[in-house]
């Protein structure tokens, strides 16, 4: 038995508003939607959106045993993230830059990482983080100590 793929499910406040952002800004196509759920695709990528639209937590007594009761509380919207692997990172970066969805701390270009990717981050209309990456060919893996600091090797 093997696993074949993972599908991120991101919490959003309003399904229809989020569908508009994902189709207009990210280039996804809505395959299915109802008031509480949507399935979107672009190329081989599938994303699910679920409605975090329960604001009853605002009127719950302070004695509630935990803040999440229904699992769809509005404060959950925008708290998720996912990573999507792409082939042409520069082209997608330019497209999403024009769409205005790059993360506020964007470096102005895709960034090469120490873990062998080149990537950039975006945020959807609710604040969910979507990072796009591509594998980077490395000639040598970095050596790090237990704190994650680069170690010089000879």
PLM ranges: what are they?
Residues 13-16, 70-71, 75-126:
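Vicinal oxygen chelate
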Residues 43, 124-126, 147:
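Residue-level recognition of short loop/turn positions
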Residues 52-53, 113-114, 121, 131-139:
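Short beta->alpha transition motifs characteristic of CBS
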């Amino acid at each position: 038995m093997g696993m074949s793929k993972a599908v991120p499910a991101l919490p959003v406040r309003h399904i229809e508003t989020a569908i508009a952002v994902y189709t207009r800004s990210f280039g996804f196509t809505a395959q299915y939607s109802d008031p509480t759920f949507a399935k979107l695709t672009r190329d081989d990528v599938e994303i699910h959106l679920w409605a975090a639209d329960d604001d009853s937590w605002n009127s719950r007594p302070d004695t509630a045993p935990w803040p999440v009761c229904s699992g769809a509380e509005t404060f959950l919207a925008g708290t998720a993230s996912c990573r999507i692997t792409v082939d042409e990172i520069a082209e997608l970066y330019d497209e999403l830059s024009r769409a205005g969805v790059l993360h506020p701390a964007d470096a102005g270009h895709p960034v090469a990482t120490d873990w062998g990717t080149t990537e950039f981050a975006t945020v959807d209309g609710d604040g969910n983080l979507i990072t796009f990456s591509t594998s980077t060919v490395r000639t040598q893996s970095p050596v790090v100590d237990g704190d994650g600091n680069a170690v010089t090797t000879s």
